[in-house]
């Protein structure tokens, strides 16, 4: 049985002080609710680099900490970059790779994502590899063609699909308030599974909120969610994972 994995992606939001306040409020509310995570659920947050070393205490210690990016080389003259070894030293367990914002604003290619994926696995980090189509591609009925191409290139030479997570995020639904229908999200995640295998954990991302996550996660081929804005509010995040 595949686990459900819900990761909140904070993107470039919250200072370290704000993150520490989030932890305090998270611990306070979850203690009052006597909240215990489902044994089949892994929940976590992809934090900015400045907050990755945040102290894990109380119920917050049950969450997995993920990074939002790292460099494909172990070390070297790469000013401003972070290595897998540095992430591991901070207790990071997962890393988001190939997010559409990285692809668009920093010109990350499938080939770069592929190198990062292999580097993550080599260093015992779980890569969350993001794929998704633009609104133009969606309207042109090219969604599956685009996803297949991204999967083939980003996951090239991957021998064990149980070592990764794939996050399907239709770009037209990220931060727009538009959400793919549950049927469409399931159809695309099922298609991704046909390109990988039954062991692959597949998340859906794109305007996921407390009021739609339950229906999304009830689908056969949707194993979790990569959540943006809703994870920034501690009460909303708790509603997502409880």
Swiss-Prot record:
Pathway: Carbohydrate biosynthesis; gluconeogenesis; Carbohydrate degradation; glycolysis; D-glyceraldehyde 3-phosphate from glycerone phosphate: step 1/1. Substrate binds at residues 9-11, 175, 207, 228-229. The keyword Phosphoprotein does not apply. The active site is at 99 (electrophile), 169 (proton acceptor). Its main location: cytoplasm. NCBIfam families: tim. This is Triosephosphate isomerase. The lineage of its organism: Bacteria, Bacillati, Mycoplasmatota, Mycoplasmoidales, Metamycoplasmataceae. The gene is tpiA.
């Amino acid at each position: 049985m595949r686990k459900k994995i819900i990761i909140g992606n904070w993107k470039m939001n919250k200072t370290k002080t704000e993150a520490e306040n989030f932890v305090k409020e998270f611990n306070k509310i979850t203690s009052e609710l006597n909240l215990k995570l489902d044994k089949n659920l892994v929940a976590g947050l992809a934090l900015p680099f400045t907050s990755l070393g945040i102290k894990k205490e109380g119920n917050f210690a049950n969450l997995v900490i993920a990074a939002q990016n790292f460099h494909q080389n172990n070390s070297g003259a790469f000013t401003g970059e972070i290595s897998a070894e540095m992430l591991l030293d901070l207790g990071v367990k997962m890393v988001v790779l190939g997010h559409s914002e990285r692809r668009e604003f920093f010109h990350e290619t499938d080939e770069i994502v592929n190198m990062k994926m292999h580097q993550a696995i080599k260093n015992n980090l779980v890569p969350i590899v993001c794929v998704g189509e633009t609104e133009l591609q969606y309207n042109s009925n090219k969604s599956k063609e685009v996803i297949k191409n991204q999967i083939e290139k980003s996951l090239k030479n991957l021998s064990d699909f149980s070592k990764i997570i794939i996050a399907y995020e239709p770009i037209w639904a990220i931060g727009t308030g538009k959400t793919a229908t549950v049927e469409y999200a399931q159809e695309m995640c099922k298609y991704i599974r046909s390109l990988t295998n039954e062991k692959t954990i597949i998340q859906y991302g794109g305007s996921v909120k407390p009021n739609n996550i339950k229906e999304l996660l009830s689908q056969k081929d949707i194993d979790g969610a990569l959540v943006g804005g809703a994870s920034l509010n501690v009460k909303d995040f708790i509603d997502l994972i409880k």
